[in-house]
C-alpha cells in the first residue's frame, strides 16, 4: 500500500531529525560517522527487558540524583565496547549504538545536554546483548532506575 503524503512528510521529518542528531554528536564528540549505528530496537523491548530490574525512587523526580551512578557505570565499561543509547528529539525517539569511549569522554553531553536529549528525563545506556545496562526512567511517582 503506497504511503500517503502525510506519512511521507512524517518519515522525511524523522530522517531529518536523525541526520541532525548524528551531525550534532559528531560535531560535539569528534566520533566518526561510521562508528555510529542506528538501532532498530524499540523502547518497549527495553522496558520489557528491564521491567523486573527497575527500582522506584519514590518522590524523587530529579534524574541528576543518579549522575554519580551513571559515571561509575560508564567508567566500568571497556572503552572498546559499544552501548545502545536513547535519544529524544522534538517528536521522535532514536536508539544509536555508540563507542563507549565516546560516551566516557563526553559524559556531560550524554547525561545533561538538552541539545541531544530534548526535554526527556529518561536515560538509557545498554549493551546490545543486554548483559550490562544503566537505565533511569521518569514516572509520575518518581524515577525508576536499573543497573546490571
Name the predicted role of every residue range:
Residues 1-141, 147-148:
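Structured alpha/beta or helical-core interaction and ligand-binding surfaces enriched in interleaved
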Amino acid at each position: 500500500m503506497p504511503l500517503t503524503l502525510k506519512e511521507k512528510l512524517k518519515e522525511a521529518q524523522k530522517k531529518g531529525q536523525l541526520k541532525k542528531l548524528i551531525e550534532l554528536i559528531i560535531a560535539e564528540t569528534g566520533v566518526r560517522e561510521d562508528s555510529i549505528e542506528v538501532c532498530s530496537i524499540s523502547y518497549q523491548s527495553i522496558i520489557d527487558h528491564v521491567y523486573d530490574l527497575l527500582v522506584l525512587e519514590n518522590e524523587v523526580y530529579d534524574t541528576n540524583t543518579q549522575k554519580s551512578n551513571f559515571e561509575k557505570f560508564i567508567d566500568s565499561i571497556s572503552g572498546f565496547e559499544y552501548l545502545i543509547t536513547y535519544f529524544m528529539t522534538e517528536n521522535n525517539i532514536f536508539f544509536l549504538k555508540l563507542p563507549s569511549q565516546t560516551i566516557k569522554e563526553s559524559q556531560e553531553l550524554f547525561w545533561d545536554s538538552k541539545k541531544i536529549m530534548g526535554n526527556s528525563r529518561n536515560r538509557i545506556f545498554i549493551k546490545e546483548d543486554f548483559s550490562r545496562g544503566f537505565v533511569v526512567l521518569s514516572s509520575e511517582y518518581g524515577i525508576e532506575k536499573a543497573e546490571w
